[in-house]
Amino acid sequence: MTSLIHLNGPPGIGKSTLAARYAHRHPGTLNLDIDSLHPLVGGWEDEDNHTHEIVRPIALAMAATQLRGGRDVILPQYLARLTEIDKFEQVAREEGAAFREVVLLAGKTEAIARFDRRSDDSAWGRHNRRLVALHGGPAMLASMYDRLLEILPARPDAVVVRCEPDAVEATYALLIEALRG
């Protein structure tokens, strides 16, 4: 059975790194990193353009197409609104695929520090750091972390995987174990 694996977690926790590793080790899997879609939209750096509203439906369509073709999707994306998670779960269900949720977590202080230590110098990385700083920096990240924890009780099938700093391979092994369970 094909799967749509939603890899959730606070910004900078390692979702994209683990998703890339997973896709590399599972040929044919689509690494649907929504952040990589933003730069494809003209004017994406202007917050007033609401690019998320454009790329989320595109991501849903990409996931549906991939699953319909009998291939897996891994989605490394912070989502703390149940309605957004439900949309991806619905796509999986409609395409006859399993919907698997894994939430990568560290303590709040460590999660915020990991965002600050992130070395992504891509256009998206610079843009994202600028937006976070503009909207409160660590306070914004703390709020995002709290919102993620608040929705977890409503997602009983989500498996939490603890992430230690500089332990990518160990965390990847925990991810694989969570997906087998």
Descriptions of predicted regions:
Residues D120-T171:
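Small-molecule kinase domains that catalyze NTP-dependent phosphoryl transfer to phosphate-bearing small molecules
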Residues E95-F115:
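Conserved phosphate-donor/acceptor-positioning beta-strand/loop module used by diverse small-molecule
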Residues P10:
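P-loop (Walker A) phosphate-binding loop of NTP-binding proteins
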Residues N31, F99-E101, A158-V161:
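Conserved beta-strand scaffold positions in the cores of enzyme catalytic domains, especially
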Residues M1-L4, R71:
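Pre-Walker A (Motif I) flank of P-loop NTPase domains
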Residues I54-E95, F99:
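Glycine-rich phosphate-binding loop used to anchor ATP phosphates in small-molecule kinases
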Residues I13-G69:
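Conserved substrate/cofactor phosphate-moiety recognition/catalytic segment
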Residues L7:
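Hydrophobic anchor at the beta1->P-loop junction of P-loop NTPases
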